[in-house]
Amino acid sequence: MFSVGLTGGIGSGKTTVADLFGKLGATIVDTDLIAHRITAPQGLAMPLIAREFGAEFVAADGSLDRAKMRALVFSDESARKRLEAITHPLIREETEREARTAQGAYVVFVVPLLVESGTWKTRVDRVLVVDCDVETQIARVTARNGFTRAQVEAIVARQASRDARLAAADDVIANDNASVAELAAEVAALHQRYLECAAAARN
């Protein structure tokens, strides 16, 4: 099935754009949502995380203590790799399972770290980047998540640069000051193009 990899930095508006594609009938497979699901109470990753990192990283409800884990992986590169060794295979497995059952004309994979991963670029037919400048990212995330500026800057620094994302893009949606209506119009135009690509891929 024809597939699009949708990516962008934190706070760029990936979820808003993905929701617009979903309303038009595309199948959305969001790796962030899958990551949250496997680290929720009774999530597939939780027994492995508890065994690897200890019970102190499990919240009272049985989910991942995200704040504690975030602090650890930002200060300890080996801890980040140990966490990813647990979560990434499970995310891949769930991602492929959802893609196999897709009912839409094409699939949009929402992958925040698509450019960084190295493998996703060859997994999808087109890469769509939702782009905005770093100051816009910082303003959105501090307002949305309650993070400090320094916390957001640290997250941005660990992600691919804006230039690297744009270099990997087949399509770009600029989302610094776009209204939802403007985004919807851009998504609708891309949707028509992707429908044509999906039809050509089936023939």
UniProtKB/Swiss-Prot annotation:
Q: What are the binding positions for ATP in this chain? A: G11, S12, G13, K14, T15, T16
Sorted keywords for this record are: ATP-binding, Coenzyme A biosynthesis, Cytoplasm, Kinase, Nucleotide-binding, Transferase
Protein's cellular compartments: Cytoplasm
One molecular function GO term is: dephospho-CoA kinase activity
Xref: InterPro entries: Depp_CoAkinase (IPR001977), P-loop_NTPase (IPR027417)
Q: What is its main location?
A: cytoplasm
Instruction: Provide the DPCK domain boundaries.
Output: 3-201
- State if Chaperone is listed as a keyword: no
- Database matches in SUPFAM superfamilies: P-loop containing nucleoside triphosphate hydrolases (SSF52540)
Q: What GO terms describe the biological role, i.e. biological process, of this protein?
A: coenzyme A biosynthetic process
Gene3D superfamilies hit by this protein: P-loop containing nucleotide triphosphate hydrolases (3.40.50.300)
**What pathway is this protein said to act in by its record?**
Cofactor biosynthesis; coenzyme A biosynthesis; CoA from (R)-pantothenate: step 5/5
Q: What is its EC number?
A: 2.7.1.24
The record, for CDD domains, names: DPCK (cd02022)
Q: What class of enzyme is it?
A: transferase
**Catalysed reaction, written as an equation:** 3'-dephospho-CoA + ATP = ADP + CoA + H(+)
Write down the Pfam families for this protein, in alphabetical order: CoaE
Q: What does this protein do?
A: Catalyzes the phosphorylation of the 3'-hydroxyl group of dephosphocoenzyme A to form coenzyme A.
UniProt xrefs under PANTHER family: BIFUNCTIONAL COENZYME A SYNTHASE-RELATED, DEPHOSPHO-COA KINASE-RELATED
- Belongs to which family? Belongs to the CoaE family.
Write down what this protein is called: Dephospho-CoA kinase
Q: What is the lineage of its organism?
A: Bacteria, Pseudomonadati, Pseudomonadota, Betaproteobacteria, Burkholderiales
